[in-house]
Amino acid sequence: MNYTFINDFLSSNVFNNCQSIIINWKYYGDNDKLYYEPKPLRERFIKPVNITEEIMKNEYIYSAAKSIVRGGLHLIWGHFPHYFKNTVNCRPNGKILEDYLSPPDHSKAYIKHYTTKSTEEFIERLNKGDVYYKFDTFYLNYKIKEYYFLFNKIKKKKLNWLIIN
């Protein structure tokens, strides 16, 4: 069943026994765009990232999700930021999620996660620094090698743009 309103989705009977609904991210990369375009994200980045073996090796990226938790619950302990121990965690189709490392399920609902946007926008974000890393060579190399090219194809134009900027 498709829902127009989030309230109808959350009120569905399939969630009667669920204490939280775990909604996986669907990743979007640069879609081979080098430059910013003044259009909404959903119009600029329409093709999701193919889930590769490299992405699957990174459990935090592979199983990233947001949770909707039922109110009035006590003693919820988040072993993983979006999966709660000793609670009934469900997927958007109402099936119980046994393990937070289960493959993502995008069949009923997902959250679009625009990881890098265009190459230009990624560089702009890099230049701002990061809350976890001070702005240094390690940070730049990590973000470009271990993050940007995890989601995007390596192409000469992108490499030149990343090196020059």
Stretches with model-predicted labels:
Residues 1-165:
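Catalytic-site signature of metal-activated, phosphate-bearing donor transferases
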